[in-house]
């Protein structure tokens, strides 16, 4: 057998948000490496009964690479399960570099991000015509510094939708930097804790209430914050489905008078969406 490493995105938590390809990759594993602190144990139900299961929360990169070397020697399939999508804050590239040096075949299987899961949970689109057409994935600088130009204040100047990972442990600083970057105090926010897990908590609030909301939830880890005017915009429509818009599959139509609806941003108060 030829060794291979399968990097699998487990999604935000709920096992039924695994993709079919992810399920098949877990079922094919001789060795499963997963982080019990980040991934719900239900995903292991798809692993073979005789698979070796290793919890990566106590492992270093060197420990993981030792497993990969053993896989090469013994022709094993290792399924490395990451939370969310492996390409976003997954510490995956350092593994890929090492696997390439070892000459082991690998595959990346994408997963549902916590950003998508949180937006779905509150019933919002993150890219609204005339309001926001970009989504910034970022985090606050902590023990791991940010590159030049990627401080939170710098990115907040764009005023578009922002998804903040790994930032809930410093709520006062988070709120301050977003405000200083240019978001208005009434900018809508969503705080999502362990979204799609049985104990998920999701709360909406204004930006000037963000720090107090996070403190009230008493969350520091497993928390995503969404910020931006698109989170409470309504009354817009896309050009793509406008009668006045012609494209490859449909000509423009005469009923174009009602094609444009101005954007309206609602006021947003603190609201528990689910608990």
In which residue ranges do the predicted regions lie?
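Class I SAM-dependent methyltransferase SAM-binding "motif I" and its flanking Rossmann-like core
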Residues: 3, 14, 85-158, 201-204, ...
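A contiguous loop/helix-start segment that scaffolds small-molecule binding in enzyme catalytic cores
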Residues: 4-7, 63, 74-78, 97, ...
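Short secondary-structure boundary/capping segments
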Residues: 23, 45, 70, 127-128, ...
């Amino acid at each position: 057998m030829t060794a291979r490493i399968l990097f699998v995105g487990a999604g935000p938590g709920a096992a039924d948000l695994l993709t079919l390809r992810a399920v098949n990759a877990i079922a094919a594993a001789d060795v499963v490496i997963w982080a019990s602190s980040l991934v719900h144990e239900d995903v292991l139900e798809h692993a073979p009964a005789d698979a070796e299961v290793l919890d990566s929360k106590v492992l270093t990169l060197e420990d993981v690479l030792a497993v990969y070397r053993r896989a090469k020697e013994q022709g094993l399939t290792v399924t490395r399960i990451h939370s969310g999508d492996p390409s976003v804050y997954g510490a995956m590239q350092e593994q890929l570099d090492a696997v390439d040096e070892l000459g082991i075949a690998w595959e990346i299987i994408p997963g549902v991000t916590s950003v998508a899961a949180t937006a779905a949970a509150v019933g919002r689109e993150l890219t609204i015509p005339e309001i926001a057409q970009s989504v910034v994935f970022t985090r606050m600088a902590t023990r791991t510094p940010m590159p030049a130009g990627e401080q939170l204040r710098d990115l907040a100047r764009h005023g578009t939708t922002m998804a903040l990972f790994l930032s809930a442990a410093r709520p006062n600083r988070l709120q301050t930097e977003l405000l200083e970057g240019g978001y208005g105090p009434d900018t809508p926010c969503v705080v999502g804790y362990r979204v799609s897990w049985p104990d998920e908590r999701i709360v909406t609030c204004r930006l000037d209430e963000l720090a107090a909301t996070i403190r009230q939830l008493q969350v520091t880890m497993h928390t995503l914050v969404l910020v931006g005017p698109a989170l409470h915009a309504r009354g817009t429509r896309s050009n793509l489905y406008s009668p006045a818009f012609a494209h490859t599959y449909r000509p423009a139509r005469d009923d174009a008078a009602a094609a444009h609806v101005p954007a309206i941003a609602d006021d947003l108060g603190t609201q528990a969406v689910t608990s």
